Amino acid sequence: MQYIQQPQAIEAKSFDIIGEIIRKTRPDYQFASPLHEAIIKRVIHTTADFDWLDILWFSDDVLAQFCAALGRSSVIYTDTTMALSGINKTLLAKFGGECRCYISDPRVVRAAKEQGITRSMAAVDIAVQEEGEKLFVFGNAPTALFRLMEHDVSVSGVVGVPVGFVGAEESKDALTKSHLPAIAALGRKGGSNVAAAIVNAMLYHMQGAR
């Protein structure tokens, strides 16, 4: 049985197929920039879902702001260990950044129990109090996104793509109406894998620009 075995070749072939399908099915579709294209295609690569051509929303200048923050040794806070695991931390470290996820932190577990809130909310409460430049990447917990907006703090960027049926669509809609520099998934779709793919696309773009 013959099949492609090299990881790089598999990925390259996948992106070739994605590009071909977009050209055939959406010949008039226009990407806003090479980075916008890279993000959309990487999310499609992750999900095999071409709806992402239409449901990924970007606030004005968010890509420039987010990439600039990544280059300034920012800390990325994720709502799940899955999102944290999916981000290319080796490449992130080359830009001086790091990832943190407090969902299982004893402080978070204790605060969530005492206050009767989700651990995702308690994790945000701790994260916003820490020093340094912050980026928030949420792919699973609408309550984390709602909580961040309740704090009304200044952050360098937010990836808000929680998936689900309870609060997911509403939290992302609220994000698009906030003052925060953000990338949001419109509707119910999303996920930790999507959140990580968006960050990785920016990191790979920055690596290529060096």
Task: Give the ranges of each region predicted by the language model.
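Conserved, well-structured core segments that form the ligand-binding/active-site neighborhood
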Residues: M1-S14, S154-G157, T176, V199-R210
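Electropositive, gly/pro-rich neighborhoods at or near active sites that engage anionic ligands
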Residues: M1-V75
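Glycine- and other small-residue-rich loops at beta-strand/loop junctions that grip anionic moieties
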Residues: P7, I55, V137-F138, V161-G164, ...
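Generic structural signal for well-ordered, non-membrane alpha-helical segments
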Residues: P7-F15, A32-H36, S59, L63, ...
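Predominant activation on well-ordered alpha-helical scaffold segments within soluble catalytic domains
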Residues: F15-G19, K41-I44, A64-C67, L84, ...
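Generic secondary-structure signature for well-ordered alpha-helical cores
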Residues: G19-D28, H45-W52, G71-V75, L92, ...
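Conserved mixed alpha/beta catalytic, RNA-binding, or beta-rich assembly cores of soluble enzyme
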Residues: T80-E150, S156, V161-G164, K172
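C-terminal functional extensions of proteins
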Residues: V166-R210
